Amino acid sequence: PTLCCNLSCSYCYLGKQTTEAALKLDAQRAVQTLRHTLDALKAAGVLAFNVSLHGGEVTTLPPPVLDALFTMIRAHYLEHFDAHNALGHKKSAPHIKTNLFKFAPLYELFDRHKVSISASIDLPLSLHARHRTTRGGTDWLPRTLDNIRLLARYPHAKKISATLSSEHLADIPALVHDIWYLHRELGFDMNQFNLMFAFGSELNRAAKGEAVLTPCTPAQQQALYDALTAEFMGTELEEGLKRNWFDEFKPSYCTNAPNCGERFYLLQSDGAVYSCVR
């Protein structure tokens, strides 16, 4: 619903769009854009089986706008419950991608709508402090950890995702250590975890210049997989390793083909449509 974001991540593929986005305008039109789209899909005989809110950062929108979006999405799932169920789709609540910066003040709203949460962090956590800062360049890692503790107690669907660049894989033992830390010390079930790899972006380079991070090499990705397999096979996180951690690289999620249009498309608040969120 908006490209605006309250962070300035080193690897953000949206570049300066996150600071130039017209948040006030997005807030005014997001609800109507979604309403128009769901109505148009229904009129065309197309069943929207997964309505997720992405960004930018969704939680930069005012709470009343979020409330209206969540209400509409829940009503959509309820209206089409039987059709979704017959096709094997189990969604019944809104889903958002969030950096957790405003998770605590919005907790009650999320809880009321049973919102499914996908929270983005950096691993190792030391790089979260360096590469996932506020727009003013401030480290907010302690607040992140507090919000992960809160997320661990959140009673609805949730997961954590981490975007990895070459710099993130320079110290794989630290990354492994922090997975255990989140799981054992902060109490978040790290079976519910996704790995993603940063990719090159001209918008990112234009915004960050020489500070841009480097995509992982195939050798680094293989080294990561080998280390995770050696560490977590035979532990309480084996299921996550086998089922979820690399889920976004499986054909059921992503075809890894340009403009495939097979599963998802991106709808902007101004009504513009793209074939993929990436």
What are these regions (language model features)?
Residues S126-L145, R149-G261, L266-D270:
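Radical SAM enzyme [4Fe-4S]-AdoMet core and its adjacent flexible, acidic
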Residues C4-C5, S120, T144:
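Active-site cores of enzymes that catalyze phosphoryl transfer or operate on phosphate-rich substrates
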Residues P1-I96, F101-P105, H113:
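Conserved alpha-helical substructure of the radical SAM core
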Residues F49-L53, P94-I96, I117-A119, K158-A162, ...:
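Hydrophobic faces of well-ordered beta-strands that scaffold small-molecule active sites
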Residues T71, E108-S116, G136, H177-R184:
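Short, surface-exposed basic-aromatic patches at helix termini and helix-loop junctions that form
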Residues C276-R278:
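Short beta->alpha transition motifs characteristic of CBS
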